[in-house]
Amino acid sequence: MDAIEQLKQDVREGRIDVERLVDLVATLQRQLQTLQQQLRVANQHIEALQKQSGDGGQPKADQPYSLRAEENRQEARKKMKKRKPKPVRRGRLTSAAKIALAVRHEEVFPEGVAKQDCQPSHVRPVWRLEQGRAVVIAYHIYRGPNSRYGKIPGALGRSEFGIEIILEIAFLVYVIGLSFDKVSALLQFFQGLQLRKAQADALLYRLARHWENEFETLCTLLAHSAVVHADETGWSLKSVWAFVSEKARVLLFGVPKDAETLQALLDPATFAGIIISDDAAVYANFSAAQKCWAHLLRKAIKLTLQAPNDPDYRAFTDRLLEIYRSACRVQRDGRLSDAGRARQVAALDDELLELCAPVWVAELPKLTDETEDNYRLLVQEVMRLMLAKELFTFVTAAPTTQPNGVSQPVAGTNNEAERTLRGVAQARDTGRTNKTLAGARRQTIVVSVLESLRLYLPCFTLSSVVAEVERWLETGRSCYQKLLAKLKLSVAERPILDRVLPKPDS
């Protein structure tokens, strides 16, 4: 039984008097008045909101498909468009504004197609460097038969910047080590080119994608070089590994320092050249090696600094340096034949044996004094490298010739690779490094291709680099690919870059 039925029964049976019933009715009436007042306030609030929204209270047309209803809908759309704010431009010029800035207009036709057989297609403004200033040139692209379009000289795809500007940015960022902010400031101050950081970043990614095949060609040339300098250093992402030869300069950014990475570029089982490196274990399996004399001499000099009053350390260091200088003189002596140099190397081995024999023959255990133990380890290292014939390889090795015609003797130190990594180490110490794998891939490609041009050009300048790269764009073949074809070599089926630096997941 609900409350209403119970109340009726109580009234019929006389359990509820009349006064109590009147009080109950009055209470319900007051509650009803309160609710009605709240409803009126809510309706007034709704009407006010509809007036503020403008069209919120607009009555809907009785005939939705009539002419009057369509006019009402169009009028409502116009009001919405008027209220929509216009997008704010961020300083980028429109194509029409760039064309208005053009210093001249040039027509570009498809190669081998006459002008009368073509028709205008579109106009592309491109920023170029002329006489040290940034100017806009409007290229009128013509379309020929079979949808063949004219190709703008010195431009990558649909980029609005010439190749000379992209190469300048790459050199300033990766070779000189400037930030994007400083590069933008330099371009604006010296050449009058306003370039945002996002634009510079996008241009470098475009250049890296365009040069991926050139990087693979350089890796193949490196694997078939006569002499390779190898060195590595720490970085924000794992390590940086530099490989410098007479045919290529390859720098790998963000790779692990292990045998698998080294095998991807220089397989010890197949590499027939000489590798010049420090005494790291990862370089232990090559058939012909030259260990860096600078590392050994620095260790010996450190002993003399730790114990300046010890005559044995001083005598050992002086004698070791004298033997190295004697080896350099034997290498430069043009009067010696191959057999004569071999005899001189045997004599140098005897001198090293005489120098190290007292400590080496004693087979001393690990010593408690750190300096004395370092001296023991250095003597053992020198003897181990001498017995492995890895100290005087440079004396009997033939000089190497670079593609630009420069001939150089094989070095007894690894200073060439260390100098290549000097700027990278400074960038690491100051925090100016890539933090992503995509950035490491980009820097690997761009730096390797740019640095390798030093071996192919007689003079490494912006004008010479631009002229060479423009020739690549015109002929479709780089100087690296020409040398690869001359040597009758082919690149690996699986890209080496994807093996050492896999593409990040998109």
Task: Please tell me what each predicted stretch does.
Residues R12-G14, V18, Q33, Q37-R40, ...:
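Catalytic center-proximal scaffold of phosphoryl-transfer enzymes
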Residues M1-E160, A230, S236, S277, ...:
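Short, flexible loop/hinge motifs at secondary-structure junctions
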